[in-house]
Amino acid sequence: MTHAPKSSPQDDSVSVRAAVNIDIPALVRLINAAFIVEQFVFDDDRISAEEARAFMETGKFLVAHDSVGFAACVYVELRNDRGYLGLLAVDPERQGTGLGRKLVGVAEDYFRGEGCCAVDLRVISQRTPLPPFYRRLGYVEIGTAPFAPSLQSKVPGHYIIMSKPLA
């Protein structure tokens, strides 16, 4: 089986907008497909429709889409003078095309526009490629935090907390 070469997000006419309630089923499919790589850590899906609705009450999802559908999304939330970025998910068929980097940049621009002085995020320690990815985007590790007691992790781990000042 051969795969078509991955194209850059600029070639795909990808645009970004805030998700609305009708987008929840597509968001859930995208996030769970992208986070399937975490099944060695957690058994359950990464997000349910109910959880996505709850996230949309405190923040918003920015979605990158094109004529094919949703290509990527990221959750953004204002927390006083800081932004919180989470659930960065890129369609597995489009990973490695720069969409994740593009969407992080859009999220940072959103936070700047809201007057935030920094962006915070957290990744699970078992996803070893993630800290270097975020470091390349200017984020630094500022600490760790335990998983919530309700999360049943199959392997030991913790959150790595990262932050980036916004100019």
What is each of the regions a protein language model found here?
Residues 2-7, 153-167:
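Terminal substrate-recognition subdomain of acyl/acetyltransferases
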Residues 80-82, 118, 159:
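A generic structural signal for beta-strand entry/edge sites
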Residues 111-123:
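Conserved GNAT acetyl-CoA-binding A-motif
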